[in-house]
Amino acid sequence: CAQAGKHIFCEKPIALDPIIIRNALAEVDKSGIKLQVGFNRRFDPNFSAVQQQVASGALGDPHIIRITSRDPAPPPAEYVAGSGGMFLDMTIHDFDMARFLSGGEVTEVHAYGAVLVDPEIGKAGDIDTAVISLKFANGALGIIENSRKAVYGYDQRVEVFGSKGTALADNNTPTSMVILNESGTIRDKPLYFFLERYEKAFVAEMQAFVDAVRNDEPTPVSGNDGLAPVLIALAAQQSLKRGKPEKVESI
């Protein structure tokens, strides 16, 4: 597409191999076309509002970034076998969100993983539950929690704790109604999965791409934004395999 002069919107990940990604980005740079990578969660109104609080300095210096991402049901083992694994398929969104929220690069990861949801995923060579610790170049720390199955729905939350305050984005629910009675508190479960949860974000990211092309402006999610989470994911895989922290620059 780049050689043909076509502007590109590419879903994540661009590829699973950093060499292939770097070669593709070189072609994009050479051709002068526009490339946007599909990290739609950046365009979620809630997460974007948290990022704006960080970028404006309202929270001071970021100290701790916490991201919770849990799917409502695990994928088939056949899908897992060809997806590149949990870190490259699922957590890659969270690695991007960590960069987006912090405004800095991840320098080190320490990943813990287990098979607690579906034994078939383990037989396919992957994990279904993970906790990943992050270190950022700007001194902040991060925690990502992942599970392939949350029985109550699609659990998508972020929190940034800074020197001047904290900003949180909670789950979206069908309604904001809360019932209080003698049995306790009742409220809606989170929206079931990504199509419902991120409907506005999908529309907003495509509009941003169209606007960038029409107005000849830089796209809001660059090729490097597509490469960086892949490097973090590969470092997380190495960390899980070796049982120790891994520098992202080693990938």
Describe the residue ranges of each PLM region:
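Beta-strand-loop-alpha-helix segment that lines the small-molecule cofactor/substrate pocket
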Residues: 1-42, 57
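Hydrophobic residues in well-ordered beta-strands that form the structural core
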Residues: 9-10, 35-37, 66, 144, ...
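A general structural signal for well-ordered alpha-helical segments in protein cores
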Residues: 21, 47, 94-95, 177, ...
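C-terminal helix-rich "cap/oligomerization" subdomain common to oxidoreductases
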Residues: 22, 30, 137, 208-251
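Basic phosphate/pyrophosphate-binding loop/patch that engages nucleotide-derived ligands
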Residues: 26-34, 48-62, 161-162
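Hydrophobic/anchoring residues in structured secondary elements
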Residues: 64-67, 111
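Rossmann-like dinucleotide-binding domain that binds NAD(P)(H)
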Residues: 77-141, 147-152, 224
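NAD(P)-dinucleotide binding in Rossmann-like oxidoreductases
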Residues: 115, 120-126, 137-204, 222
